Amino acid sequence: DVAGRCHVVPVGVDLADVPVRSVDAPTPDVPTVLWNQRWDHDKNPTAVFNALGRLADEGIGFAVAVVGENERVDPREFTLARERLGDRVVQFGFLDRPAYADLLGRADVVVSAAHHEFFGIAVVEAIAAGCLPVLPAHQSYPGLVGDWADVALYPDGGLTTRLRDVLVDLPAWRARAVGLDASIRRFDWLTVVSDYDDRLERLAVDGPPLGAH
């Protein structure tokens, strides 16, 4: 039984410089929505930008920060989104680590529509900083948010609706997500590395599991 001899250990995320948000931190009049993933098609940024554009057309108040690594010569959908969202865009493009950590502490909502997400380091960083997640109910995300799935995950086709609900009443959604930021810090490298060390030490002492090759 291969499954019985296997154990998946998550990657560690460096959260040492990610700020911790106070549980009684005030909710801003204009919340900031953060998109902080790699600028590539598998992250499905167009779906996020379309949702934000529709909510902007409805007159819902929010600001947008679009950050992440970009190796594309012509990220057309990003350029169009910046033009459409106009003055709502408060940050656009790559940030060095100190500036990025500062932004994490100021953002209010982190959003994703990714088609492929094997873990989700950027999302973990944002949740650890106190951002309320708006994530699809697939990929790695259910495993990240655990007991907060009803708060953090939206169903297929439900991005715009969930994002609207969150932006209209962010304090209520934050109240439902209390504890998620602390829970996600279980992926901090300083926590994960002790599990790595324990398992490698047992393997060195006891040898591989029976039947392993």
Regions found by a protein language model. Give the residues of each.
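Donor nucleotide-sugar binding/catalytic pocket of nucleotide-sugar-dependent glycosyltransferases
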Residues: 1-20
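Conserved donor-binding/catalytic core segment of Leloir-type glycosyltransferases
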Residues: 24-43, 49-53
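Nucleotide-activated donor-binding/catalytic signature segment of Leloir-type glycosyltransferases, i.e.
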Residues: 76-95
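Short alpha-helical donor nucleotide-sugar binding micro-motif in glycosyltransferases
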Residues: 102-107
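Aromatic "clamp/platform" in nucleotide-sugar-dependent glycosyltransferases that forms part
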Residues: 115
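Short hydrophobic beta-strand element within catalytic cores of glycosyltransferases
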Residues: 132-135
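A charged, aromatic-enriched C-terminal amphipathic alpha-helix characteristic of glycosyltransferases
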Residues: 158, 171-207
